[in-house]
C-alpha cells in the first residue's frame, strides 16, 4: 500500500538456510524498481535467485487485464497441472498477450520510460513536500499523501475530482486505523505540466481543508 520494498535479500538468505522456495509478487515493482525497471529482484541484485515470480499486465505493462507466473521449467510444468486459478480460468485475448509481449520488448530495449517515471515521481514528491504535505517514503511510483482521517481522505479525494484530478482515498480497513491517505499513482506518461497542475490542486484544496497552511 505504501510502495515500500520487502527485504528480499534477507528473505532469500533465510530460504537458502532452511531449504525453502521464494515466491515474489512483482505486480507493483516490475517496470518500476531497479536500475532498469526489472523489479525488486534487480533492486537487490537477486535476478535468477527467486524460484517463482508473478506479475500483472494491469500496471506498468500497459494497463491491460491478466498476469503471468514465471520460474524454473519444472515448477511451471507442475503449476500448469495443479494451479487451480490457471486451470479454471479462460485464456487471455490474443490482443492482450501481444500487447504485453510488446511492452516487455519496449522495456528491455530502452530505459527511457523507466527513467522518465523516476524523474516524475521525484518531481511530484518534491513539489508536494515543499507545499507542506506529509508524503510517505517510497521506492515505487506510489505516493501516499497522509491525511490520517478517514472522512477527510474521502472528502479531499472528492474535491480533487471536482478539479479534474482522479485519485482514491484509502482508509480503514484497507489501511490501519488513523493512517488514512490519498494514494497517487505517478506515471511515465504524465507531463511536468500535468504533475504541476495536480500539485496545485492539492495545494488549493489542502488550504481549503486546513491540511496545509
Regions found by a protein language model. Give the residues of each.
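Active-site core of PLP-dependent enzymes with the aminotransferase class I/II
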Residues: 1-21, 152-153, 193
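Conserved PLP-binding catalytic core of the aspartate aminotransferase-like
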Residues: 110, 115-124, 129-164, 174, ...
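Active-site PLP attachment segment
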Residues: 36, 42-78
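Short, small-residue-enriched loops and turns at beta-alpha junctions
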Residues: 1-2, 29-33, 86-87, 144, ...
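PLP-dependent aminotransferase class I/II
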Residues: 61-128, 133-136
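Helix C-cap/helix->beta junction micro-motif
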Residues: 17-18, 131, 163, 209
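PLP-dependent enzyme catalytic core of the Aspartate aminotransferase-like
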Residues: 162-165, 174-213
Amino acid at each position: 500500500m505504501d510502495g515500500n520494498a520487502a527485504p528480499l535479500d534477507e528473505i532469500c538468505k533465510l530460504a537458502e538456510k532452511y531449504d525453502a522456495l521464494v515466491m515474489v509478487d512483482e505486480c507493483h515493482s516490475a517496470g518500476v524498481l531497479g536500475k532498469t525497471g526489472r523489479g525488486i529482484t534487480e533492486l537487490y541484485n537477486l535476478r535468477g535467485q527467486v524460484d517463482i515470480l508473478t506479475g500483472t499486465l494491469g500496471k506498468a505493462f500497459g494497463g491491460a487485464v491478466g498476469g503471468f507466473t514465471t520460474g524454473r521449467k519444472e515448477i511451471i510444468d507442475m503449476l500448469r497441472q495443479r494451479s487451480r486459478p490457471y486451470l479454471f480460468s479462460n485464456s487471455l485475448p490474443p490482443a492482450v498477450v501481444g500487447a504485453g509481449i510488446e511492452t516487455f520488448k519496449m522495456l528491455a530495449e530502452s530505459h527511457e520510460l523507466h527513467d522518465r517515471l523516476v524523474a516524475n515521481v521525484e518531481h511530484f514528491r518534491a513539489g508536494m513536500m515543499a507545499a507542506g504535505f506529509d508524503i510517505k517514503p517510497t521506492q515505487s511510483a506510489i505516493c501516499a499523501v497522509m491525511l490520517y482521517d478517514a472522512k477527510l481522505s474521502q472528502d479531499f479525494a472528492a474535491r480533487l475530482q471536482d478539479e479534474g484530478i482522479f485519485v482514491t482515498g484509502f482508509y480503514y480497513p484497507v489501511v490501519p486505523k488513523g493512517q488514512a491517505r490519498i494514494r497517487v499513482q505517478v506515471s511515465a506518461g504524465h507531463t511536468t505540466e500535468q504533475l504541476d497542475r495536480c500539485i496545485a490542486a492539492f495545494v488549493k484544496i489542502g488550504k481549503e481543508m486546513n491540511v496545509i497552511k
